[in-house]
Structures are given as structure tokens and as C-alpha cells.
Amino acid sequence: MIKKASLLTACSVTAFSAWAQDTSPDTLVVTANRFEQPRSTVLAPTTVVTRQDIDRWQSTSVNDVLRRLPGVDITQNGGSGQLSSIFIRGTNASHVLVLIDGVRLNLAGVSGSADLSQFPIALVQRVEYIRGPRSAVYGSDAIGGVVNIITTRDHPGTEISAGWGSNSYQNYDVSTQQQLGDKTRVTLLGDYAHTHGYDVVAYGNTGTQAQPDNDGFLSKTLYGALEHNFTDAWSGFVRGYGYDNRTNYDAYYSPGLPLVDTRKLYSQSWDAGLRYNGELIKSQLITSYSHSKDYNYDPHYGRYDSSATLDEMKQYTVQWANNIIIGHGNIGAGVDWQKQSTAPGTAYVEDGYDQRNTGIYLTGLQQVGDFTFEGAGRSDDNSQFGRHGTWQTSAGWEFIEGYRFIASYGTSYKAPNLGQLYGSYGNPNLNPEKSKQWEGAFEGLTAGVNWRISGYRNDVSDLIDYDDHTLKYYNEGKARIKGVEATANFDTGPLTHTVSYDYVDARNAITDTPLLRRAKQQVKYQLDWQLYDFDWGITYQYLGTRYDKDYSSYPYQTVKMGGVSLWDLAVAYPVTSHLTVRGKIANLFDKDYETVYGYQTAGREYTLXGSYTF
């Protein structure tokens, strides 16, 4: 049956728990409703990526991990470290909520969307990815979906790894997790990654001067976590991480002015939590602080020159989550408080501003016979636009053993970001962007194939756009998104297959024109097998036709970008029980394509890596 585990035993740890692990026969997830539950009881489409998956794929960036997942469309202005956007099910990049250990990613505060090209892949131990509306649980941004990156390791030991590759890529990483007595464990990590890169922009997008240089990326990361069990029921943790990145990119050149083409990002985050894990009642309190400084400057003049820009953001968060088991399900409730502050002189916001938000929410999940019911409601009180409410509901019916029909409806919203509100062209009277979504799905297990097929519609109103005439942001846009998503995974002998298909018709509801940079169709296929102790993997991705703007001349022209098929080949060999060597060829057939018009992709790339564990 689909219901492989009782909800009474499933809800054993509170949401955002760093101890969550994959278990057999059903993976446990914590992101869907802020409490741990079997993935089969989550009615929204959910995907889990483990560190073992990331190592098997030999991914060198978070974007390379996410591009493999259903409903995800990644665009990037070139290679490693270059500006990137995540589109989920055709929604805007700002309509994706990115969490780090359950806490909102700070870097999205000023610009409004998460650029995961800057987040170190070394920190990622697990990814939980939920499609569809989730504002009734998490508040702003969760229109297209939620990506929760979990950083804490789930196994003890020490690992030393090194890798090299095309474009002078090199990576060195050391991590360890040690038990201090029976009740305490500590985790430490250090990582260094660097690539010389390549020239990402074709002449024409950079103004009157070509910039035939390598656009490289450098990242240095430190991480530490301390976890302690006070009793069988009470536990706590403290963790922190920081990274220092430098990115070289191609910028638009204006004669006589400095060429701002270097980005320097400093980011640090600290959080602490206390958990109570009783038999029927669970509770967790988390406090978090994060601080980022994002400089863009001309390296000839330095990042403190008047030509440089700085985006500086501080974020303070307090979360109190609770869960109680009732009947064949549970009820959850909690409070979120968040303050985002910009420093005076921030590029988007000249003066210093604070934005505060307090949200209260209630969630529920109950099984009644062959039916599963899920609901959530939330009210947010924002210091800028006042109170806003969202809700969602879902129902699942297992009409035949192993087969289920799911129907859901939800509302969600996106709050204006600080740049849109208070920047040089800001409008403090902006309202939130609003969404209404419907979805119907069938899923089941047929002849060893786990499959799901769903259709959805998303109507987004009050979209925030920029007016070239008034030089202000305003609420006027509307979007209409219709889509079909199909996923399946199965084994044939020694071969493991994972496949997905996405059809997305994302349009401006006023002009009936396609939304930019979204592929209308995508096919993704992962094939894994073992032969003579070698672990092999083939990744295939088809990106369909999409549209973009050519910004090299005015007026801007809409351009059509053709589809492309991409193949990756990866292999790993365990030399000993401690030493593993890995190799990968990305873009095996050296396809020439772009995800953002005018910005070149890397072509064929090679990587070779080794890891030693003890």
C-alpha cells in the first residue's frame, strides 16, 4: 500500500531537525509541513536528494543538482559562480522559497530571488524539494515551490577529497563528524574551490568594447556544528557557516567609466535551537542570524571606490514550531518572526531600512480509511503592507491498493523585496504578488514502476513590474501557467532508471505572450548501474524551445532559443574500502547552447576527483 508507515510513528522528530535521515522502506521528510513524516504521506509532489546522490552525480554546484529535478528550469549567465535563476513550474525566480536548514536564505532579501550559484556545494548534505504552493506553511515566496538545503551530516567519520578539471578547476575539502561521549557530536568542514572559467559573453552584450577574458570563480567555506542530547526527550544544537566568494564576469562597458566586472560576496550564518521530542508532543525553538556583504566593483579601483556598489543585508529569525499527534495524524502550529535590515548605502536601497514580519500558522494531517486529508492556514503581519492570509487544502484517495488520486488547491504570495520598496526607483505602496493554484494527480506502483502524473494551473496577479516611463515599480502584471508533470522510477535487472517529463505553458495573461527563459518542454533521465565494481551513471536532459530578450540593442528584441539535448557520463571506482576515485564528462557531445541569450555555456568539461574516508 502507499501508506507504508503509520503517521503515529512517523511524526517522531520536529520540523527542520538536523537528525533527519533516509530510512527504508519510506524516506522521511521534514519540509512539507514542518514535521517529520514519510514521503508517501505528503500529498504535494516531493523529491529528496541525499549526499550519496550528489557524490554519484559528481555535481560541482548546487545548480547542477537542482537542474536534474522535476519542474526545475535553471538559467545562468555563463559558468561557475555566474548569476543564475531557478524557475519552478514556470513561476518567476522570485517565487521559489530557498531554505537553509529550514531558515530563509538571507541573500534573497534585497534582490528578491535566490542565486544559488554562490552557495557552496560542500555544505549540501541533503535537499528536500516540494512543488506547488506552500505560503500557508512558510509565508512569502513559496509560490512555485520550496527548496530546503540541509547542511548537517548524518554519519560520523572523516573525509578528505580533492578534484581537478577543465578550465583549471580545482577543489579541496576536509570534513569530519566526531562523537564526544554518548550525547554530543561535533561537525567541522573546510572547502576551497577555484576555476579560471572562460569568456562567458559574446561581443555585443558588453557595450562598445569586447572583453575577451576568463570569467573565473573562487570560493572558500568554513562550517561547524555542535549537537547535544540533554535527555531522551530534550536536545539542542548550535551551528554556523561562512563563505567568501569572488566572481569575475563580463559587464556592460561605457566609455570613460570604470568597468565594474568583479563580485565579492561575504556571507555568514549562525543558528541555535532547542528541541523537545516527546511521544505525543514535539516542539522546537530556533533562533538565527545571518549577514551578507555583496560588492560589485572595478578591480583596478577596488571595492571601496565610489564606482563600486554594496548590497548589505542582516536577517534575524525566530521560529517556534509545535506538533501533536491526534488520531491517525497530527496538528501543527507555530510562530515565525523575521527582521531584515539593510545598511545605509546599499546599492538597491540608499538609506538603511528594516522590514519585519510575524507569521502564525496552523497545519493538519489526518488519515481516515483510504483517505488522507491535509490543510494549512497562515496569517502574516508585515511592517510594510500589513496583514495577509493564505491557505491550502489537499485530499488523497487510495481507490485501489497501491493507487491514489490527489486533488489540491492553495493560495500563496510574494512580498515586495526591499529594493522594490525603498530603492532609487522603489515604490513603498506596492502590494504582494498573489497566486491561486489547482492541481490534480494520479500516482501508483505498476509492475515495479513508481509513477506519478499531475496537471496544474497557477494564476498569478499583482505581479510587480518596472515602468520605463514613470521610473517606478508597480503592481499590474498577471501570469497564467498551465502544466503537466510526469515522473517514474524503476529497476530493470542491474539498471536503475529515473525519468521525468514537464510541459509548461507559462504566459503573460494580459498580452498572451510566453514568459521568458522557461522551456516549454523538458525531459530528464538518469540511468545508474554497477559493473565489475565500477559505478556508472548517465544523465540526459532535453531543454525545449524558450524565448529571451536581446539586450544588445534598443529597442530590445524577443529572440527564440532552440531546444538542446545534453548528456553526462560519470564513473566511480572504490580502490579500497576507504579510497574512491571518480571521473565525469559533462556535456558529452559538446553541444553549443545558451540558457540566457548572449551568455555562453562551458561546452564539454572533464573532472577527476578522489576521496578518502576514515
From Swiss-Prot:
Residues 155-614 form the TBDR beta-barrel domain. SUPFAM superfamilies: Porins. Its main location: membrane. Cyanocob(III)alamin binds at residues 83, 85, 92, 110-111, 251, 309, 517, 551. One of its GO terms (cellular component) is pore complex. Keywords: Calcium, Cell outer membrane, Ion transport, Membrane, Metal-binding, Porin, Signal, TonB box, Transmembrane, Transmembrane beta strand, Transport. GO terms for biological process: monoatomic ion transport. The keyword Ribonucleoprotein does not apply. Ca(2+) 1 binds at residues 199, 211, 213, 215, 250. It is a multi-pass membrane protein. It is found in: Cell outer membrane. It comes from the Bacteria. Ca(2+) 2 binds at residues 213, 215, 249-250, 261. Belongs to the TonB-dependent receptor family. BtuB (TC 1.B.14.3.1) subfamily. Involved in the active translocation of vitamin B12 (cyanocobalamin) across the outer membrane to the periplasmic space. It derives its energy for transport by interacting with the trans-periplasmic membrane protein TonB. This is Vitamin B12 transporter BtuB. It comes from Escherichia coli O6:H1 (strain CFT073 / ATCC 700928 / UPEC).
